[in-house]
Design a protein with these regions (language model features):
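Conserved, mostly hydrophobic/aromatic
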Residues: 31, 112, 165, 238, ...
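Alpha-helical scaffolding within the catalytic cores
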Residues: 13-21, 50-51, 96-99, 149-150, ...
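N-terminal catalytic cores of secreted or lumenal carbohydrate-active enzymes
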Residues: 15-163, 167, 182-188, 192, ...
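C-terminal beta-strand-rich structural cap/linker in extracellular carbohydrate-active enzymes
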Residues: 419-445
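Active-site neighborhood of glycoside hydrolase catalytic domains
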Residues: 142-146, 156-158, 164, 171-279
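Aromatic/acidic polysaccharide-binding cleft in carbohydrate-active enzymes
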Residues: 271-343, 354-359
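Solvent-exposed beta-hairpin/edge-strand motifs
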Residues: 396-414
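Carbohydrate-binding surface patches
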Residues: 360-402, 435
Length: 445
């Protein structure tokens, strides 16, 4: 059913979308299955195919984040970092992660990013991949050789084209799992070595930094690296994690998101948010978790001007994943968070431009996107309040045919198609249910 609305007076609770005011280009959305790729690979059929279809096709992701695999070079291939001793590398390891990446490719995922959690143990001060430890300065050339071999080898042996490489995941953080700490100055010096190696080997993977655990520390790393022209020339993307923002208070991070956006403008780099998720249990698997998650996505896109957003835990054995998979491999559960993030991931295509969208009501979060190739408009509205809100959407400088399909996620709806609506005189009037996420799109799905 198509609804027609004629609106003559603009009320206080209006939304305005202006196609003439443009911001960042969207590279895409995605996530990671890091550490638990075996869960999906070992899931019994037909469940395995069902989950792979949900994650790599239905959800709409185009970016899959991998862990750069150390075991391809568990011991030094030789003492010459300027020469690949290919016979000493082992590309038969990492089969779970490789299987996941290939299944993603089969379903249309086109972009692969790999982040380094730790270099091989023999390169580090503590001779372990876990805990703390740092990359020994005399091993910078060996690191560059290893990560280059990883990129070249995964393309040759597995057909996985790693287009983005995170030099170090959370260089500011230590844990009992794989980590490696770097000062901003150490990261700067390593980038110079890796960048030169990539040039010599013809590697076109984009270098991503600093992937700190939070935004605040990212600023210092960026300042140090970008103040050195010999390092700055190799940096392609700024990346952050959001763990310094309280999960249940997304707006507390707005000022820091604005700060990182200003750094991106200053240095002319796109921003990717490459990891964030709710890591506790009280809200895990609940609709509350889903509603907080999309508020973080909204803020990162609108205030951080991020070009990509990657969730942590696409799938997990816990309910904190978009899909939880049993360790026994005999069942799975799609959580509300899956449908909530789908409201962004499914409908905002790579290459789209974020355009201006303003809401007077603080309970209505709105963002809008223009696909210049097809002239399609996507509008995502989050009503985070406890009451339904009826409002007008005023469309300015929009040239596409104003017929929108509506999809909604709420406590009882799961990215459900709820009908078409046509703007009359470039104005819509819609009711957004309490605690809901609605996507309006002119694209034919």
């Amino acid at each position: 059913m198509i609804s027609y609305f004629l609106i003559q007076n603009i009320g206080e609770k209006s939304i305005e979308v202006d196609g003439a005011r443009k911001y960042q280009r969207i590279d895409g959305f995605g996530g990671s299955g890091a550490y638990y790729e075996w869960l999906l690979k070992n899931l019994r059929e037909p469940y395995r195919t069902e989950v792979a279809d949900l994650l790599f096709s239905d959800l709409g992701i185009c970016i899959y984040r991998l862990r750069a695999w150390t075991k391809i070079e568990s011991i030094n291939d030789d003492d010459d970092p300027n020469r690949f001793n290919w016979e000493a590398y082992d590309f038969t390891v990492d089969q779970d992660q490789v299987w996941n990446a290939i299944e993603a490719m089969k379903r249309g995922v086109t972009k692969f990013m790999a982040s380094v959690w730790s270099p091989p143990a023999w390169m580090k001060s503590n001779l372990r991949e876990t805990d703390d430890g740092y990359l020994l300065p005399e091993m910078y050339e060996e690191y560059a050789e290893w990560i280059s071999a990883y990129i070249l080898g995964y393309k040759k042996h597995h057909g996985i084209d790693i287009g983005w490489i995170g030099i170090q995941n959370e260089p500011d953080y230590t844990a009992t799992w794989e980590t490696c700490v770097y000062t901003p100055e150490q990261l700067r010096d390593l980038i110079k070595v890796v960048g030169k190696k990539f040039e010599r080997e013809g590697i076109t993977a984009k270098i991503v930094i600093p992937e700190t655990s939070g935004i605040q520390k990212a600023l210092r790393y960026i300042e140090v690296v970008m103040s050195d022209p010999d390092a700055a020339r190799y940096v392609d993307v700024f990346a952050i994690h959001l763990y310094d923002i309280p999960f249940t208070n997304p707006d507390e991070g707005v000022s820091w998101l604005k700060a990182i956006a200003s750094y991106c403008t200053r240095y002319g780099k796109p921003l990717w948010m490459t990891e964030y998720s709710y890591l506790d249990f009280p809200y895990a698997g609940t609709y509350e978790e889903a509603l907080y998650t999309v508020q973080h996505i909204h803020n990162t896109l609108v205030y951080g001007n991020a070009s990509a957003y990657l969730v942590w835990e696409l799938f997990w054995y816990r309910e904190t994943g978009l899909i939880s998979i049993s360790r026994a491999g005999d069942h799975y559960n799609v959580t509300p968070k899956y449908y909530a993030v789908k409201q962004f991931f499914k409908f905002i295509s790579p290459g789209s431009i974020r355009i201006d969208a303003k809401s007077i009501d603080s309970q209505l979060l709105v963002s809008a996107y223009l696909d210049e190739k097809n002239n399609d408009i996507m509008i995502v509205v989050i009503n985070r309040g406890k009451s339904d809100i009826t409002t007008k959407i005023i469309l300015k400088n929009i040239t596409s045919i104003p017929l929108f399909k509506q999809y909604r996620t709420s406590r009882t709806e799961y990215c459900k198609y709820i009908g078409d609506v046509v703007a009359k005189d470039m104005t819509l009037e819609l009711t957004f249910p309490s605690e809901s996420i609605t996507t309006l799109t002119t694209r034919k799905q």
